[in-house]
Amino acid sequence: RPEELSAAFAEAKAEAQACFGNDEMYLEKLVLRPRHIEFQVLADRYGNVIHLGDRDCSVQRRNQKLIEEAPARCLTPELRERMGAAAVKAAKAVGYENAGTVEFLLDPDREHFYFMEMNTRIQVEHGVTELVTGVDLVRQQLRIASGLALRLRQEDVTLQGHAIECRINAEDPVQGFRPCPGRVDFLHFPGGPGVRVDSCLYSGCELSPYYDSMAAKILAYAPTRMETIRRMRRCLEEFTLEGFPTNAELSYQILYHPEFILGECTTAFLDEHLSELLEFSRKLSESGVDAVSYTHL
């Protein structure tokens, strides 16, 4: 709370002095209900740096992304250009060489954005960028690592269509997203035009409890955002995994929520709406109908 800031700051200074012999402190701006917007960059050892557009990763639980999409619906062309230029400038400033992601927080007025971090690797959600740009990011990363110069120039990068990714995690949203690894008794992934699935699972395999709970990534692509949303809904209708709980049903319900359809989700979305989403699922479960089947009917 604001009234506690002064005392907390003094306490933190004392702790820093006691632990590290240095009580220097800095303050970061608190951005309430921001959007999580990130830019994919490629940089070679010859100083060539480009960005491949943006991703909106605001639908999260415990600061871990659940649904990602490209491009971000909330960005104007002017803001996209400014944020992309900032991402490229940041990568150049540190002499970066690799594929990477520059992540920002965008405040509610959609005018001011703040650097959060840079992920110096290929990210889980890189597939949505590949779908809207047609650029194979892993191939580009291997070329960079081999010492080759980027062939792509910024003017070569165009964003076409819309892509959405849903992470399928072995976890139970009803139990506070408790990890639920185990044996895959039966598995069926969706398919068809504009659908991509990245996973190593198969019927009969064991999902280990010793690693991340993510079991698969389902991606959908179409010419427009609404078409992509409909395609992803169909993907989650077709997806079947028997053996342990996943978050697939929750993601399916999110795709029907008005805030998601309008592109208005912030990082606070699940905190604000999880109870109602789970309550809907619970009522259907008590009636003997799962949410996916209900909505499909």
Please tell me what each predicted stretch does.
Residues R1-L32, R62-T76, R82-G95, A149-L152:
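Conserved ATP-binding module of the ATP-grasp superfamily
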Residues A87, G127-L297:
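Catalytic cores of soluble metabolic enzymes centered on carboxylation/carboxyl-transfer
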Residues E3-A14, E81, A85-K92, M116, ...:
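Solvent-exposed alpha-helical segments within well-ordered globular domains of core cellular machineries
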Residues L52-N63, L105-I122, L187-S208:
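Flexible glycine/proline-rich, aromatic-decorated loop/lid segments
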Residues S6, D44-A86, I122-L137:
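ATP-dependent carboxylate/phosphate-activation module, predominantly the ATP-grasp catalytic core
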